[in-house]
Regions:
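N-terminal signal-anchor transmembrane helix
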Residues: 74-81, 114-116
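A structural motif detector for short, solvent-exposed N-terminal "entry" segments of globular domains
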Residues: 90, 112-113, 220
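Conserved AWS/pre-SET-to-SET junction and N-terminal core of the SET lysine methyltransferase domain
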Residues: 104-110, 204-205
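Alpha-helical transmembrane signal-anchor/signal-peptide segments
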Residues: 107-126
Length: 253
């Protein structure tokens, strides 16, 4: 951490950037930025230097360090050199902020099933707060930001299955209560491909499994039973919201 703070001072960037280097997914964007900023701090500002720094995953910095006599540019301009560079910098900043919000604060979802049709309809768009119950730290550390399990318009995975972080969740501001509507990932270990008779299975990290939205009716420690279509918790009838109550009679015209 100390080395990262010193590096931020060398490249003339704020020390709080160090935090971004340790946030999964965000760090995949920040590391290339740091490589480029380090090169420019020693006068390497050409497009070729930038390309070599990116294509070698930063090892180009080690190469020029031992093969060239470089001078540190202490008073370099931190502003982009051109309108194109300014646009790229703005886009990167927007992606970093959006990924932070998307991963740890609020995420948009689309309702995939009709099980909550009295409250939510299939195809409805909604925003889900991750702060209330505590955001889960991404387990797939190498993945494209702002997408789920596949790259749009392709059938390719948007992530690598290795390396993976263990399951970890940040502290929340409230506990899950009965009758809360919650978004979660499909909990089973493997997923069968829909409409595929070959019984092939898709193995995914927990955070890349399909998103589902359901109503919570039981919490840890509850004794749950269903009698005549009604839910009982610890022997008492669960009081559901009006739109969540079972319907036993229908009017037929």
């Amino acid at each position: 951490v100390y080395n990262a703070i010193v590096l931020m001072k060398i490249i003339g960037r704020p020390t709080w950037w160090t935090i971004l280097l340790f946030i999964p997914i965000i760090n995949l964007i920040m590391f290339p930025v740091i490589w480029i900023e380090t090169l420019r701090s020693f006068g390497k500002r050409s497009a070729l230097d930038t390309f070599l720094g990116l294509i070698t995953l930063g090892f180009y910095i080690y190469y020029i360090n031992y093969t060239q006599d470089l001078e540190y540019v202490a008073d370099r301009s931190l502003s982009p050199d051109s309108k194109t560079a300014d646009t790229i910098s703005s886009l990167l900043f927007a992606v970093v902020v959006a990924t932070l919000v998307h991963t740890y604060l609020i995420q948009p979802y689309t309702i995939p099933t009709s099980s909550l049709e009295k409250s939510l309809l299939v195809g409805d768009f909604l925003f889900v707060s991750k702060m209330n119950y505590g955001a889960r730290v991404p387990m797939a550390t190498i993945a494209l930001p702002m997408v789920h399990d596949s790259i749009p318009f392709t059938k390719s995975k948007s992530y690598l299955t290795w390396p993976q972080l263990p399951y970890m969740r940040l502290p929340g501001i409230q506990n899950i209560n009965r009758t809360d509507i919650v978004a979660f990932n499909w909990p089973v270990d493997t997923v069968y491909r829909f409409f595929d008779t070959s019984k092939r299975r898709a193995y995914k990290p927990v955070d890349k499994k399909s998103n589902y939205v359901k109503r919570c009716v039981g919490i840890p420690g509850d004794s749950l039973s269903i009698k005549d279509g009604l839910i009982y918790i610890d022997g008492k009838l669960l009081q559901l919201p009006e739109r969540a109550k079972p319907q036993f009679s229908y009017k037929v015209a």
